Amino acid sequence: MDKATVYYFVGIKGSGMSSLALILHDKGYQVEGSDIEQYTFTQKGLAAAGIKMLPFSEDNIREGLTVIAGNSFTDDHPEIKKAREMGLPVYRYHEFLGKLMEGFTSIGVAGTHGKTSTTGLLSHVLSHIAPTSYLIGDGTGKGTPDARFFVFEADEYRRHFVAYHPDYAIMTNVDFDHPDYYKDLADVQSAFQQFGNQVKKGIFAWGDDESLRHLDVDTPIYYYGTNDRDDFQAVNIKRTTKGSSFEVKYHDESLGKFEIPLFGEHNVLNSTAVIAVSYFEKVNLDEIRRELLDFSGVKRRFSEHQVGDMVMIDDYAHHPSEIKATLDAARQKYPDKEILAVFQPHTFSRTKALMDGFAASLSKADHVFLTNIFSSAREKSGDVSSKDLAAKLPNGGEIITTDDMSALTAYHNAVAVFMGAGDIQKYEKIYEDQMK
């Protein structure tokens, strides 16, 4: 690491990129970067830190920069191309992160779903007990001087996580996703196998996931879950409108009762994983208990507020399993209210590949509203539409647009759960303005 260079992020508003930029800034390095001019929720933290954000332009590239390129951008991007032509050091995000974690007790959180929530929970618990640096996929990052732990989100997309060799890994689940890259579930499984082989001290894996049960690695694997065969077992689970409580057993030893102000079974599982890895690092159980009780969640994961007589929940869910978990959490907290699912399908390839799963998960809501499919930078069009998904829903689904939300605004004293990984917040803003 070089204090003389300026670390320049191409795509600085990306969720992982903004987190990494904040870590380097906290550690006293010079940081700036470029991105689209449209506002994204990650830039709030960058602006608060005084980090310069520029529009994309090859004129930004100059001598003295070390370029960190976001994974969404190809080598043909004008800034990356110019940096290479000038002979500047250029790293991909995952390559640089792999270098950064050396010298800490590193804990990577991997899984098709639940990465960000679990990384956020683990970061919260450890950082209030011991010096901890962390990188969360919601745009939050912190670089702590003399940190003992480095907690980070390990993304399976395009096998980026194989750049990492952490001490520990939490693996929340393995599911088929990213159909623009992975061929099938077996392809995803092979990526997790490859990552698992690089973990040094221990893997903490969800025991109900058959793919994780079949991991074949030399590193010890400790399973967590709610069954007797799990090494770390959550028992006596109680779910109320205030949160969840449970006891954790490690084999025959009770680690005591824990309470979380969180909803949905997935949060009990995520918490059990956090307790397990912390226990192995000999973190005091009473301190873990205290910090779990104080966790308020991460950005865009079941973020809620009131608008008139409506409860609005904003969530990043964009896969059938995530939608199911989010709606389950909404039912736990609001058992007596109607649940309205407002979903923006993310990419044509994912919508087509997981169509039946989306229909099954969305049907857990009382009413479903769909926006048009959000296209990514890599994929502008496809042969499927939101109307195809609406037709698969047992009770149908209504298509809403930014110009016409009348079908949604007709509801009152209910819970509107907005879900998606694209620009669903644009719809939320319009809805909110109309409901005020």
UniProtKB/Swiss-Prot annotation:
Q: Where does ATP bind?
A: G111, T112, H113, G114, K115, T116, S117
UniProt keywords (A-Z) are: ATP-binding, Cell cycle, Cell division, Cell shape, Cell wall biogenesis/degradation, Cytoplasm, Ligase, Nucleotide-binding, Peptidoglycan synthesis
Q: What is its EC number?
A: 6.3.2.8
What is the protein name stated in its UniProt record?
A: UDP-N-acetylmuramate--L-alanine ligase
State if Cell division is listed as a keyword. Answer: yes
Where does this protein come from, organism-wise?
Lactiplantibacillus plantarum (strain ATCC BAA-793 / NCIMB 8826 / WCFS1) (Lactobacillus plantarum)
What do the Gene Ontology cellular component annotations say? cytoplasm
Encoding gene, per UniProt annotation: murC
Q: What class of enzyme is it?
A: ligase
Q: Which pathway does UniProt place it in?
A: Cell wall biogenesis; peptidoglycan biosynthesis
Per the record, the similarity remark reads: Belongs to the MurCDEF family.
Q: What does this protein do?
A: Cell wall formation.
Kindly list the biological process annotations in GO that this record carries: cell division; cell wall organization; peptidoglycan biosynthetic process; regulation of cell shape
Subcellular localization is given as: Cytoplasm
The question of whether Thylakoid is a record keyword is answered with no
User: What GO MF terms are annotated?
Assistant: ATP binding; UDP-N-acetylmuramate-L-alanine ligase activity
Its recorded reaction(s) are: UDP-N-acetyl-alpha-D-muramate + L-alanine + ATP = UDP-N-acetyl-alpha-D-muramoyl-L-alanine + ADP + phosphate + H(+)
Q: InterPro entries in the record, alphabetically?
A: Mur-like_cat_sf (IPR036565), Mur_ligase_C (IPR004101), Mur_ligase_C_dom_sf (IPR036615), Mur_ligase_cen (IPR013221), Mur_ligase_N (IPR000713), MurCDEF_pg_biosynth (IPR050061), UDP-N-AcMur_Ala_ligase_MurC (IPR005758)
Q: Which Pfam families match?
A: Mur_ligase (PF01225), Mur_ligase_C (PF02875), Mur_ligase_M (PF08245)
